[in-house]
Amino acid sequence: MKTIADLHIHSRFSMATSKEGTPENLDFWARKKGISLIGTGDFTHPVWREELKERLVSEGNGLYRLRDAYVKEESRKFPGEGTRFVVSGEISSIYKKNGKTRKVHNVILLPSLEAADVMAQRLEKIGNIHSDGRPILGLDSHDLLEMMLDVCPEGILIPAHIWTPHFSVLGAKSGFDSVEECFEELAPYIHALETGLSSDPAMNWRISKLDRYQLVSNSDAHSPSKLGREANLLDIDCSYEGLYRAIQTGEGLEGTVEFFPEEGKYHFDGHRKCGVSLSPVEAERLGGICPVCGKKLTMGVDHRVEQLADRAEGFVKKDGKKYESLVPLPEVISACMGYSTASKKVQGCFEQMIQTLGTEFDILRNVPSEDIKSCAGERIAEGIENVRNGKVKRIPGYDGEYGKIQLFDEN
């Protein structure tokens, strides 16, 4: 079964998230976008877990769906069987290892809410899991993996957004130089890595040590409307077992939907306070120091990949999965109309397109240009074609500042 899956998301119980992060709204936005399978997010949070138990029903195969009584009326107009949920959560581990402070985020997928109960009980002995849906714990990533395997051998641990400077397994600030250094003798139990918004598969192909891992992509959405910024293209039996096989072996993982990596917040080196954005070559020439204030630059993902790469830029992995780089539809409409994504004009056009043409992913990936033109006009049709063909100008993000993707030549 062809499925689009977004496995790393957050509920309203994580810090800096939208209050809209409820099971009903997640189901609604997933349907609207054309996503068949999403993570629950935040399984460690006790209140959220109880809400999931109340509002979701097990399908008996390791996946859940929203109980019919909770499905929003406006969700029912979208075709298909509705959204499937898989139990998921993210843990922020901050700890000392090999003489350095490490800050690593890991995503865990589990086949049941019962397994989540046991995992949460174990984690609660280590630290506070009540105040943040993504708990911050003084727990070595190796020990987290060991705990998960003990509690639930069928669990899946995926290092999250692996290149982010501050909170990832390979990050420049507080990560490691290899997955093996982080997870030691348990590294063979890691089968997939999340590339994050600021990198794409091609960047990861440059590091031969990563060849054995499946590369997955997820939105890390902090509000339901951000679901699917990145996602996985699957052709699987729609069950936890099918998902497990895809992530652990690649069977049924057909590819990913990506941000243009330059749009991510940490693609280039830079210093946001001074408005300084630099390529790896420029940053090296300056010794990693901000030319305005003299402070240390935040090293971006592009530079960090360059540090660890043993293959030239442009290398194509023979068995690498396909990937598509897209721009969210509201951003396309915004660029074409000249209004902000939150404006009534842009939101009105977005709703009209969804109502007439289908889901957001269908519009961005499949709907013929002529149909888009008939519904939304020539400029929006052209903008979507430019995205599909990669004919865009990329202004890289840096030091927490999102990059910009220009769909039209502004000259």
What is each PLM-predicted segment?
Residues 1-93, 98-101, 391-393, 402-410:
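An N-terminally biased module of ancient metal coordination in phosphate/nucleic-acid-related enzymes
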Residues 8, 42, 85, 108, ...:
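Divalent metal-coordination and catalytic microenvironments
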Residues 15-18, 49-53, 167-174, 205, ...:
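Histidine/acidic-residue-rich catalytic or RNA/ligand-binding cores of hydrolases
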Residues 212-228:
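Short acidic/histidine-rich active-site segments
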Residues 254-324:
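Cys/His-rich short segments
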Residues 333, 338-411:
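Low-complexity, acidic/Ser/Thr- and charged residue-rich accessory regions of DNA metabolism proteins
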